[in-house]
């Protein structure tokens, strides 16, 4: 079993995580994906994971992180573009989401194929 695409590298220090915060944000109910184009297409993609203390105790936070890491390893890693950095910020719903659904949501966010937004005419319901 040889994979055609190599697994993404890791973001390891605070300055790398902070640099990605300046990039694009792709929001969702289960997690947020922050993406930064490093403008170096020949380099491998890199990924980092963040789970804040507000999301639960250490056991729950580690479980969220492990689920996201495994989803990236199994399927979402191949969707990552070379020369890009990704930070995945977990929300509590990561624990309750079925794993296949989590994988598909992660691929969707990484590829940037989110649901289309409402048009300006239908946006306000109060008028």
From Swiss-Prot:
It catalyses: Endonucleolytic cleavage of RNA, removing 5'-extranucleotides from tRNA precursor. GO terms for biological process: tRNA 5'-leader removal. It is an enzyme of class 3 (hydrolase). Pfam families: Ribonuclease_P (PF00825). Its EC number is 3.1.26.5. One of its GO terms (molecular function) is tRNA binding. The keyword tRNA processing applies. GO terms for cellular component: ribonuclease P complex. Keywords: Endonuclease, Hydrolase, Nuclease, RNA-binding, tRNA processing. SUPFAM superfamilies: Ribosomal protein S5 domain 2-like. InterPro entries: Ribosomal_Su5_D2-typ_SF, Ribsml_uS5_D2-typ_fold_subgr, RNase_P. Belongs to the RnpA family. Consists of a catalytic RNA component (M1 or rnpB) and a protein subunit. RNaseP catalyzes the removal of the 5'-leader sequence from pre-tRNA to produce the mature 5'-terminus. It can also cleave other RNA substrates such as 4.5S RNA. The protein component plays an auxiliary but essential role in vivo by binding to the 5'-leader sequence and broadening the substrate specificity of the ribozyme. NCBIfam families: rnpA (TIGR00188). PANTHER family: RIBONUCLEASE P PROTEIN COMPONENT. This is Ribonuclease P protein component. It comes from Agrobacterium fabrum (strain C58 / ATCC 33970) (Agrobacterium tumefaciens (strain C58)). The gene is rnpA.
């Amino acid at each position: 079993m040889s994979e055609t695409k190599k697994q993404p590298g890791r973001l390891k220090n605070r300055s790398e995580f902070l640099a990605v915060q300046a990039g694009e944000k792709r929001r969702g109910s289960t997690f947020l994906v922050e993406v930064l184009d490093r403008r170096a297409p020949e380099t491998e993609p890199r990924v980092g994971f963040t789970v804040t203390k507000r999301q639960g105790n250490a056991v729950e936070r580690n479980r969220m992180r492990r689920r996201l890491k495994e989803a990236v390893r199994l399927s979402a890693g191949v969707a990552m573009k070379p020369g890009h950095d990704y930070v995945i910020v977990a929300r509590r719903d990561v624990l309750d989401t079925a794993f296949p659904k989590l994988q598909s949501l992660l691929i969707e966010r990484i590829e940037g194929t989110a649901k289309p937004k409402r048009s300006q005419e239908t946006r306000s319901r109060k008028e």
